[in-house]
Curated annotation (Swiss-Prot):
Domain IPT/TIG: 381-471
Region listing for Disordered, in residue ranges: 1-31, 489-554
Entry similarity comment: Belongs to the Su(H) family.
Quaternary structure (record): Interacts with activated Notch proteins.
Keywords for this protein: Activator, Developmental protein, DNA-binding, Notch signaling pathway, Nucleus, Repeat, Repressor, Transcription, Transcription regulation
Function: Transcriptional regulator that plays a central role in Notch signaling, a signaling pathway involved in cell-cell communication that regulates a broad spectrum of cell-fate determinations. Acts as a transcriptional repressor when it is not associated with Notch proteins. When associated with some Notch protein, it acts as a transcriptional activator that activates transcription of Notch target genes. Required for the transcriptional expression of Brachyury, suggesting that it participates in notochord differentiation.
Native source species: Ciona intestinalis
Lineage of origin: Eukaryota, Metazoa, Chordata, Tunicata, Ascidiacea
Name this polypeptide is given: Suppressor of hairless homolog
Basic and acidic residues biased stretches: 508-519
């Protein structure tokens, strides 16, 4: 049977031997398990001969930017998992789900089928596990769909971890390419839902406004009857197959019903007004008051924090005791009955009782820019932020994130930048000259915006969804090779290097004042960073590794 390979540490480059071992797992036995065979290793070696590493060309990047054939893998899961004791198996609920998005999957499938001459070569196989050697990985059955669920995963009490991550292993069949191993976000292990009144001391179990949750209903505690709140074809429904992620927003009590609404920060408490918005479609339910459930009653005066795996009810605000309820696959309104003996309770049916749990997702996007590769695409780098240092000819960009390796380059649009690997969390690159993107830039006054991507040395593209904006401004042009010297290992400039002098002055609009200059006006590029529409002005000094290395005129 197939046992999981351990993922490499962030930024660690896998050895060829490890990749050969990983590729060997693509041979299948008749029982659906996997075995390592010499023929599989030989097949992987022949794959390296067939798909040698190819450096990404400018034309290939230009084609990608025009028509991205991305492959996106999403691992959707709950933030907490209930531990199983003894021989019981408390399967994760909602079950972890894997989505394959983008045209790149079908494109790669077609390429492999054509080149190998068999449909098996294009078949994608996936396995999932909890990252433990005690438990075998389970096969995920895609069956031509773009999603699948792992319905029988659990964690036993013999596993002493307080947190864990799911591992997904993917490869193409017929001795084909190993896609790689992908991790989920971190999952917290809990023993059982707390029945005590919660406090914010256990904030990691509470649910904050603006976070994502899943809601499911289980009639008479039967696992087979579990249904999940989901949006499909523009309608809310109760699905037994797919579950949806919903942003839960806290509202002011006096907030009126509207498509646009103001949200409040803080943790969700019972008795408060909330809004549930589908993360995928943006569809929202009317204003709801979340109420605590005790057996088959909704408690009207409960005000403690909502906690993981609590049962709750959703009263439709300003209605006559109407609650969000399911009836088989339909979502309906159910009218509760006042409790005759307890005025602070209303009687509801099983369909109006929902279990709430926080959710998370890990998302990976990549593209084979030069065609199929023999090496896995993992580790997939993840960019968190960009920081511009300096300006003019010496502008440098710090790329901050995780899972960086030394074989990555930063690309500005279709231009590869000189890049220096600093660590698994940081890259440093020189901002290319604006003339590389636009001819005659000296006579163009508008800004030029280009996407930022990371590219591996075998042509694999990792999009960042971030952009960089060049903003030409008038002024004398600077000439200083210090940035290239830094990257190419030349002598480091003195920390006390004086600023480059700038003749003349600028008026309030930023235009040069020609009467104060002895030289004619020449354009100067001062790149400004624009991430999601928020410009960040360049800093006057570039600080790298804690040393003030270069000053430029501001």
């Amino acid at each position: 049977m197939y046992h999981p390979h351990h993922l490499p540490a962030h930024g660690q480059v896998q050895s060829h031997q490890h990749r050969e071992d990983a590729a060997a797992t693509s041979s299948r036995d008749v029982n659906g398990g996997l075995s390592v065979t010499e023929s599989a290793i030989a097949s992987f070696r022949s794959l390296r001969e067939k798909y040698p590493p190819k450096k990404l060309t400018r034309d290939a990047m230009r084609r990608y930017l025009k028509d991205p054939n991305d492959q996106t893998l999403i691992v959707l899961h709950a933030k907490v998992a209930q531990k199983s004791y003894g021989n019981e198996k408390r399967f994760f609920c909602p079950p972890p789900c894997m989505y394959l998005l983008g045209n790149g999957w079908k494109r790669k499938q077609q390429i492999l089928e054509e080149e190998e001459g068999s449909s098996e070569a294009g078949q994608l196989h996936a396995f999932i596990g909890i990252g433990s050697s005690e438990q075998e990985m389970q096969q995920l059955h895609l069956d031509g769909k773009n999603f699948c669920t792992a319905k029988t995963l659990y964690i036993s009490d013999t596993d002493k971890r307080k947190h864990f991550m799911l591992n997904v292993k993917m490869f193409f069949g017929g001795g084909g390419a190993d896609v790689g191993q992908f991790s989920s976000k971190r999952i917290k292990v809990i023993s059982k839902p707390s029945k005590k009144k919660q406090s914010l001391k256990n904030a990691d179990l509470c649910i904050a406004s603006g976070t994502k949750v899943a809601l499911f209903n289980r009639l008479r505690s039967q696992t087979v009857s579990t249904r999940y709140l989901h949006v499909e074809k523009g309608n809310f429904h109760a699905s037994s197959i797919q579950w949806g992620c919903f942003a839960i927003h806290l509202l002011d009590d006096d907030e009126s019903e509207s498509e646009e609404f103001s949200v409040v920060d803080g943790y969700i408490h019972y008795g408060q007004t909330v809004k549930l918005v589908c993360s995928n479609t943006g569809m929202a339910l009317p204003r709801l008051i979340i109420r605590k459930v005790d057996k088959q009653t909704a408690i009207l005066d409960a005000d403690d924090p909502v906690s993981q795996l609590h049962k709750c009810a959703f009263y439709l605000k300003d209605t006559e005791r109407m609650y969000l309820c399911l009836s088989q696959e339909r979502i309906i309104q159910f009218q509760a009955t006042p409790c005759p003996k307890e005025t602070n309770k209303e009687m509801i049916n099983d369909g109006a009782s929902w279990t709430i749990i926080s959710t998370d997702k890990a998302e990976y996007t990549f593209c084979d820019g030069m065609g199929p590769t023999a090496d896995p695409v993992t580790p997939v780098p993840n960019v968190h932020s960009l920081q511009l240092n300096g300006g003019g000819d010496v502008a440098m960009l710090e790329v901050n994130g995780e899972c960086f390796t030394s074989n990555l380059k930063v690309w500005f649009g279709e231009i590869e930048a000189d890049t220096m690997f600093r660590c698994a969390e940081g890259l440093l690159c020189v901002v290319p000259d604006i003339s590389a993107f636009r001819e005659g830039w000296k006579w163009v006054k508008e800004s030029v915006q280009v996407p930022i991507n990371l590219v591996r040395n075998d042509g694999v593209i990792y999009p960042t969804n971030l952009t960089f904006t060049f903003t030409p401004e008038p002024g004398p042009r600077q000439h200083c090779p210090a940035a290239l010297n830094i990257l190419h290992g030349s002598k480091r400039p003195s920390a006390s290097m004086p600023p480059t002098p700038v003749s003349g002055s600028e008026d309030d609009s930023g235009r040069g004042n020609e009467s104060d200059r002895g030289d004619p006006i020449m354009p100067i590029k001062r790149p400004a960073l624009d991430v999601h529409g928020r410009p960040v002005a360049p800093e006057a000094a570039a600080t790298m590794n804690g040393a003030n290395m270069l000053r430029t005129a501001s």
